[in-house]
UniProtKB/Swiss-Prot annotation:
Record gene name: hupB
GO CC, alphabetical: cytosol
Record's function text: Histone-like DNA-binding protein which is capable of wrapping DNA to stabilize it, and thus to prevent its denaturation under extreme environmental conditions.
InterPro entries per UniProt: Hist_DNA-bd, Histone-like_DNA-bd_CS, IHF-like_DNA-bd_dom_sf
Gene Ontology molecular function, alphabetical: DNA binding; structural constituent of chromatin
Protein name: DNA-binding protein HRm
Keyword line: DNA condensation, DNA-binding
PROSITE patterns associated with the record: HISTONE_LIKE
Pfam families, A to Z: Bac_DNA_binding
Record-stated family: Belongs to the bacterial histone-like protein family.
SUPFAM superfamilies: IHF-like DNA-binding proteins (SSF47729)
């Protein structure tokens, strides 16, 4: 499912216009992104948790040349599925 399909499904289930559903989906994504950017976590009971993890610097290899390259440390988004979501897909 892509974003347009998600918007259409939200519009159908919530009885919204596609424009309103698109605004709602965008607002949810922007809110999650903003909270993670500010170092916060989002905990949605029964669905899952969004958080930020720190990936330390490491050494890697260029697969074409075999040359060693430095991979800098960075923050990466992380999602952990909750029990309700895990149960729903099994």
């Amino acid at each position: 499912m892509n974003k347009n399909e998600l918007v259409a499904a939200v519009a159908d289930k919530a009885g919204l216009s596609k424009a309103d559903a698109s605004s709602a989906v965008d607002a949810v994504f922007e809110t999650i992104q903003g909270e993670l950017k500010n170092g916060g976590d989002i905990r949605l009971v029964g669905f899952g948790n969004f958080s930020v993890s720190r990936r330390e610097a490491s050494k890697g290899r260029n697969p074409s040349t075999g040359a060693e390259v430095d991979i800098p440390a960075r923050n990466v988004p992380k999602f952990t599925a909750g029990k309700g979501l895990k149960d729903a897909v099994n």
